[in-house]
Amino acid sequence: MSKFIEPSNEEIKLEKLYQDMGLSDKEYDKVVEILGREPNFTEVGIFSVMWSEHCSYKHSKPFLKQFPTTGEHVLMGPGEGAGVVDIGDNQAVVFKVESHNHPSAIEPYQGAATGVGGIIRDIVSIGARPINLLNSLRFGELTVKQNQRLLKGVVSGIGGYGNCIGIPTTAGEIEFDERYDGNPLVNAMCVGIIDHDMVQKGTAKGVGNSVIYVGLKTGRDGIHGATFASEELTEESESKRPSVQIGDPFVGKKLMEATLEAITFDELVGIQDMGAAGLTSSSSEMAAKGGSGLHLRLDQVPTREPGISPYEMMLSETQERMLLVVEKGTEQKFLDLFNKHELDSAVIGEVTDTDRFVLTYDDEVYADIPVQPLADEAPVYILEGEEKEYNTSKNDYSNIDVHDTFIKLLQHPTIASKHHLYEQYDQQVGANTIIKPGLQASVVRVEGTQKAIASTIDGEARYVFNQPYEGGKMVVAEAYRNLIAVGATPLAMTDCLNYGSPEKKEIYQQLIDSTKGMSEACKVLQTPVVSGNVSLYNETRGTSIFPTPVVGMVGLIEDVSYLKEFKPKAGDKIYLVGETRDDFGGSQLEKLLYGSVNHEFESIDLSDEVSKGKLIKQAIRNGIASHVQTVGKGGLLVTLAKISAHYDLGMQAQLDVTNAQLFSETQGRYIVVVKEGQTLDIDQAQEIGHLTHQQLFDISNSDVKMKENVSDIKQKWEGAIVQCLTTQD
């Protein structure tokens, strides 16, 4: 007789308790078909998390297959903990982005902190040492106190974990819109470096080999976290605080160092982080990839308190844990290592040749499931989409008050400086950060070499909402340009797809079209997708977030020498590269003046992005450019002001654009600051002005002449978010 009191198989079926765990009637019937019998309580729990949207991608898998995943530099693509890309000299960069949206909505500090911890372990499980962290965040409008609380909690959680574990946070983006009220987006990215011959895989093979658990003792925190992440947020979500995990960065640091030492042991067969769905996903996925069976003895699992049932053990998402498979007879070598690092560890099972996933507790069987169907036969749903109707009318931008519009855009929290927030992150730990958070992609030196890794994380929402296909292309191209702007060669990307409920036709169509656009851009820009994550059901009280694909992209700088002189000075000339058109659909200007973002915009020319990018990268590496900035949200005037304020330099420029075009967000444009005495010889390059010692932002077109003190601009730009957070409390 079981020592744990749980519903019987019959009760589960008759009362449809499986629905509370996330399985539909059809999915339950499929489980019965696979097992040839009714599942017990633990088995239902296991199937429910493995077949959740978060783990199985059952609504998005068809779209993910269209992404290019191979390329000249790709060593390992999707399917493992993170992607691996060659950077020469037998070295590789390892990277991935993950979402922690739902947990952060309920417990912002812990939700964000554990998101950072989880993505770090993904990188470490491949065998790489993390070199930097990035994040992409979305919140509702900052005039709402709840959004202020979420922002403060998330930023504190990111800084608290990253700073303690000793990994710099070097880049990110934060945007604000009412569509994220109650449903913030917290996407965390980690980048690491590894030698080719040290790359690990999450596989369980070799009959008789042992399974070792290491890390924090298992508790009841995070149970059904994967299922929670696959649901819409409702008023009842607050009651699911137990589904939010609790992080411990100090144990995380020990686990990271112990893992990086363990991968040097030849006797290590496979390793995987216990992330979403905890012990269930890590163990069953390792068995599936190894074509093996597993027998886990759950009475051997280290637990935080007595009485934790097999169901709770398998579904717990206690943080800071890894699962290893090691050669039989070498267990003590690994246990001694973990003991040295003051970590709990235990041998909890072995690899079998049965192709079954068997769980016992005190020799009583609590689950007996065929491995492959559990891991690989989750249902895939292809639904019906519905095209959105676009507003083809034209807004009137002929009577813009340039100065008033400029100040309002500069102070909008989405555009305003995030300096106050980023200063809570340790940006320099490890002493390899070359370019810190600010205007550009981050650059981190590869220790012991002249190489560096440039990384950026960029999301797009309004444009994807307006025209999903074009918006999908746009978000990939934006990341590409940000790497070009520091002289890096873009190599590959990771993505996080944040959308509402795919069961709503319009949102499903957004997913179809935007991923098609992203795929097209990846192919033309030669940036294959090597890892990623999908987060659906981002809705609060029936209102969906904007469709928000986020792209993390890495690039290689073979020799960082040119970066010593990559800083603008007075006397340097300013060039605008690219044509400025009347592109206002989806722009900050449209939102500011009309409160909506429902107008079409010009398509993006990907071939032009490639040719232009090569020329600008060459100008940077040849020492011609002292700074390059992509023209982004808010348009040309705002971009120029940010450069002036960031570097405390005056600027004088004459712009051949209309008043409205000062704020146009035409894609594919760069501001290139050229060193005094040099010339930028590039098609579409127009010299528009120069930098000055005089602290004056002096910009004009044929209609308006603007003169502002740089210090005033800087105060408005840097003080906007601080003012929101202090005056609204």
From Swiss-Prot:
Its EC number is 6.3.5.3. It comes from the Bacteria. Its main location: cytoplasm. ATP binds at Y57, K96, D495, G532. GO terms for molecular function: ATP binding; magnesium ion binding; phosphoribosylformylglycinamidine synthase activity. The keyword Amino-acid biosynthesis does not apply. It is an enzyme of class 6 (ligase). The active site is at H54, H100 (proton acceptor). This is Phosphoribosylformylglycinamidine synthase subunit PurL. The gene is purL.
